[in-house]
Amino acid sequence: LLASSAASDVYKRQTYMDKTGRNGLRIGDLELDGWEEKFNTLTNKHLNLINNFNVDIDFDINKLIEEFTNSINFIKSLRFIDSEHYLNESLNNGKKILGEGAQGSLLDIDFGTYPYVTSSNTTAAGACTGLGIAPNKINNVFGIFKAYTTRVGSGPFPTELKDEIGERMAKIGNEFGATTGRPRRCGWLDLVILKHSITVNGVTELIMMKGDVLSGIDRIKVCTKYKYRGETIDYLPYSCLLYTSPSPRDTDK
């Protein structure tokens, strides 16, 4: 409800908190009498949070409520279904379903570069919890990756390029966050991270994108190992907060 370009991340987290706090407003609630009361309770909760934390956000609550109400009226004109029942019935009838994840594996709340992650499961397992489909119903997992590495916002990035090559990748690859519009950080392909992602997702096929972005670069490098606590490792360490750096011998390929 109270989302704005300056505070979208804040309220996205509040939405996750509503869910895990078991007081969120769900689509199915719109078919029940009294959903407006639940909505008003949540609205007051978030307004109190803003006041308590003294957050400086410019918004018109009445305008936001009006926009929300108009959206609800449109949603209620649609047919509501139990999505997990619909999807499983489709599978039982021989239909094929393709699910698409919206975020990278390293943003996963459990297996990503915590705490620089999102608030949900972005790995293939998230398709099960998000859609209500059992793990044994998934036949193939397509791992889609870029020929180089990108990241939006803060967090560890061992192969990041803070030079003209990194800027070139961002410009040619049009690397801006899909939701926030923030420029993405760019760097060489990190095979350690890629291997980790393949493992935790159970990837069966790999698809590489944006190889053309690297056209014209005389020497293309990849990272195959990390220097970590004086040792050379080829896996993602437990904590991303501990210092890791690409091994020069293994990135110079």
Where do the protein language model's features map onto the residues?
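Catalytic core of tubulin tyrosine ligase-like
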Residues: 15-78, 82, 90-94, 102-245, ...
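Single conserved hydrophobic/aromatic residue that forms the stacking wall/gate
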Residues: 1-7, 11, 243-253
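Basic (Lys/Arg-enriched) interaction patch that binds polyanionic ligands
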Residues: 86
